[in-house]
Amino acid sequence: MGRLDGKVIVLSAAAQGIGRAAAIAFAKEGAQVIATDVNEMKLKELEAYKGIQTRVLDVTKKDQIENLCKEIDRIDVLFNVAGFVHHGTILDCTEADWDFTMNVNVRSMYFMIKTFLPKMLAQKSGNIINMSSVASSIKGVVNRCVYSTSKAAVIGLTKSVASDFIDQGIRCNCICPGTVDTPSLRERIQARPDPEQALKDFLARQRTGRMATAEEVAHLCVYLASDESAYVTGNEHIIDGGWSL
């Protein structure tokens, strides 16, 4: 018996990083996973795992989300993972940077939740998990202005949905990681003028002396997706190795 036996889980940004680790962890616990991403080539790799189907999806496109929803008869868990990290202060952030970040990090969740929530309400049960960050309303982080703003909005969205539908069988929580060692992070480090120093800077702020792994975050994802967390809603779940202390 798996902890997620029989549950249908839809998640975004599943091709790599936390999304990929979560998709694999969900499937290993018995869930039927519909893994989505814009990266078709990387996404296809997940089809090697029993219990995982894949769909190419751009979460900023409302029509694509609606078409996916029509394909699915039932959904137990919606996990919104897709996100973009902009580096810089408010003075480094152009209007285009602002709009792109907000579209990927917040508007996509608005689209996903608004599309799939009616199906959950009809079932009288549903579980929504949103990916936020410690870099949000939890902690001010240097050079994360628009990113932190967007992730603070995710916390607000999470609490609002949880409050509005708590008496209709709906739960909504968000996950707030600190620094996680993912392909996305490694790409950002390599894009810096001095990648070696950038890596040292990331490690220096880790009170545990290391970054989290995507698999460690996936353990929390499994808990929140399972009935073990049935009494948990409207919360931001911090997993940051003590960075926010």
From Swiss-Prot:
**Active site positions, chain numbering:** Y147 (proton acceptor)
Top-level taxon in the UniProt lineage = Eukaryota
Q: Which UniProt keywords apply?
A: Cytoplasm, Lipid metabolism, NAD, Oxidoreductase
Query: What pathway or pathways are given for this protein in its record?
Result: Amino-acid metabolism; Siderophore biosynthesis
Please name the top-level EC class of this enzyme.
Answer: oxidoreductase
Q: For substrate, which residues are the binding ones?
A: R144, R188, R205
Could you tell me what reaction this enzyme catalyses?
cis-4-hydroxy-L-proline + NAD(+) = 4-oxo-L-proline + NADH + H(+); (R)-3-hydroxybutanoate + NAD(+) = acetoacetate + NADH + H(+)
Could you tell me which InterPro entries the record lists for this protein?
NAD(P)-bd_dom_sf, Sc_DH/Rdtase_CS, SDR_fam, SDR_superfamily_enzyme
The residues listed in the UniProt record as binding NAD(+), with positions renumbered to this chain, are Q16, G17, I18, D37, D58, K151, V180, D181, T182, P183, S184
Annotated signal peptide: none
> What Pfam family is a match for this entry?
adh_short_C2
Recorded GO cellular component terms are: cytoplasm
List the coiled-coil residues. Answer: none
- GO biological process annotations for this chain's record? heme metabolic process; lipid metabolic process; siderophore biosynthetic process
| Cell compartment(s), UniProt | Cytoplasm
A GO molecular function for this record? 3-hydroxybutyrate dehydrogenase activity
- Name the EC number(s): 1.1.1.-, 1.1.1.30, 1.1.1.104
Quaternary context: Homotetramer.
PANTHER family linked: DEHYDROGENASE_REDUCTASE SDR FAMILY MEMBER 6, DIHYDROANTICAPSIN 7-DEHYDROGENASE
Q: Which family does it belong to?
A: Belongs to the short-chain dehydrogenases/reductases (SDR) family.
Q: What does this protein do?
A: NAD(H)-dependent dehydrogenase/reductase with a preference for cyclic substrates. Catalyzes stereoselective conversion of 4-oxo-L-proline to cis-4-hydroxy-L-proline, likely a detoxification mechanism for ketoprolines. Mediates the formation of 2,5-dihydroxybenzoate (2,5-DHBA), a siderophore that chelates free cytoplasmic iron, thereby regulating iron transport and homeostasis while protecting cells against free radical-induced oxidative stress.
- The name this protein carries in UniProt is Dehydrogenase/reductase SDR family member 6
Species source reads Xenopus laevis
